Curated annotation (Swiss-Prot):
The keyword Signal applies. The gene is RBBI3.3. This is Bowman-Birk type bran trypsin inhibitor. Disulfide bonds join 125-185, 126-143, 152-159, 156-172, 193-248, 194-209, 199-207, 216-223, 220-236. It comes from Oryza sativa subsp. japonica (Rice). Residues 1-22 form the signal peptide.
Length: 254
C-alpha cells in the first residue's frame, strides 16, 4: 500500500471517529426540566427599600404601579433603570430609580415613617388592611382604604392621594403599632380571613375565596358542600369587590 493510500485511510478513520463522538450514544430523548426545577419565575424584588417621594401611576389596574422619585447616592440593587438626577443634592451626583413596580403596598417612608407611628389606631375599621414588612412585636399596620378628604384629614396626621382622578379620595399614611388592626368595615362573605383568595386585576379587585371550611360565614349567601368531603367541608361561592383580607392564622384551623 502506498504512503498516499495509507494517509487517506488514516484521515477517513479519524473523520468517522469524530462523527461517532458527535452523535454520542444515540440517545435522542428530549430532556425536560427536573422535578426540582422552578417552573415559575421568582417574584421580583421591590426597586427601593423605602421611599419618601412615591408616585402612583394613573393606570386603573390592580395591584397599582408605583415609582419612587427619591434622589439617592446609590440606587437599590433591585433597580433596573437608575438614572442621574439633574442638579442632585449630593456631592458627586444623585440618582433616581425610574422603575415602575406593581404592588399593593409601596413600603414605608425613609425619613417620615416614624412621624405617623401611633400606639392608638387612627381608624375604627378598615377593609384594605396591610401589615408592614417590619419585625417589631406588636406588628405595624397601615390602612389603605380610600376615604373622603374630610374623613382622612380628621382621623389621620398624614394623608396621600389615592389612585384615580385628581382631586379625589385620600389614603391615610399613619402607621398603627399594635396587635389588633381592628375589624373590617364591610364583612367579607367568607369571614375575616382567606388562604386561597383569587382576584382579578381591576382596582378595586373582585375576589373569591376557595378555602374549604367546617361551616361558611354568616355573610355567605352561596355556601356549597365540597363533593365527597367527610367530614363535610364547605366553600363560599360568593364574590366580593375589594381587598380579600389577610390570610388565616393558623392555617390548620380553617
Amino acid at each position: 500500500m502506498s504512503n498516499t493510500t495509507m494517509a487517506t485511510s488514516t484521515i477517513l478513520l479519524f473523520l468517522l471517529a469524530g462523527l461517532a463522538a458527535a452523535h454520542g450514544d444515540g440517545d435522542t430523548t428530549i430532556r425536560l426540566p427536573s422535578d426540582g426545577a422552578k417552573a415559575s419565575r421568582p417574584r421580583a424584588a421591590k426597586p427601593w427599600d423605602c421611599c419618601d417621594n412615591i408616585e402612583i401611576s394613573r393606570l386603573m389596574i390592580y395591584p397599582p404601579l408605583y415609582r419612587c422619585n427619591d434622589e439617592v447616592k446609590q440606587c437599590a440593587a433591585a433597580c433596573k433603570e437608575c438614572v442621574e438626577a439633574p442638579g442632585g443634592d449630593f456631592n458627586g451626583g444623585a440618582f433616581v430609580c425610574s422603575d415602575w413596580f406593581s404592588t399593593v403596598d409601596p413600603g414605608p417612608k425613609c425619613t417620615a415613617a416614624l412621624d405617623g407611628l401611633s400606639m392608638e389606631r387612627p381608624w375604627k375599621c378598615c377593609d384594605n388592611i396591610k401589615r408592614l414588612p417590619t419585625k417589631p412585636d406588636p406588628p405595624q399596620w397601615r390602612c389603605n382604604d380610600e376615604l373622603e378628604p374630610s374623613q382622612c384629614t380628621a382621623a389621620c396626621k398624614s394623608c396621600r392621594e389615592a389612585p384615580g382622578p385628581f382631586p379625589g379620595k385620600l389614603i391615610c399614611e399613619d402607621i398603627y403599632w399594635g396587635a389588633d388592626p381592628g375589624p373590617f368595615c364591610t364583612p367579607r362573605p367568607w369571614g375575616d380571613c382567606c388562604d386561597k383568595a383569587f382576584c382579578n386585576k381591576m382596582n378595586p379587585p373582585t375576589c373569591r375565596c376557595m378555602d374549604e371550611v367546617k361551616e361558611c360565614a354568616d355573610a355567605c349567601k352561596d355556601c356549597q358542600r365540597v363533593e365527597s368531603s367527610e367530614p363535610p367541608r364547605y366553600v363560599c361561592k360568593d364574590r366580593f369587590t375589594g381587598h380579600p383580607g389577610p390570610v388565616c392564622k393558623p392555617r390548620a384551623e380553617n
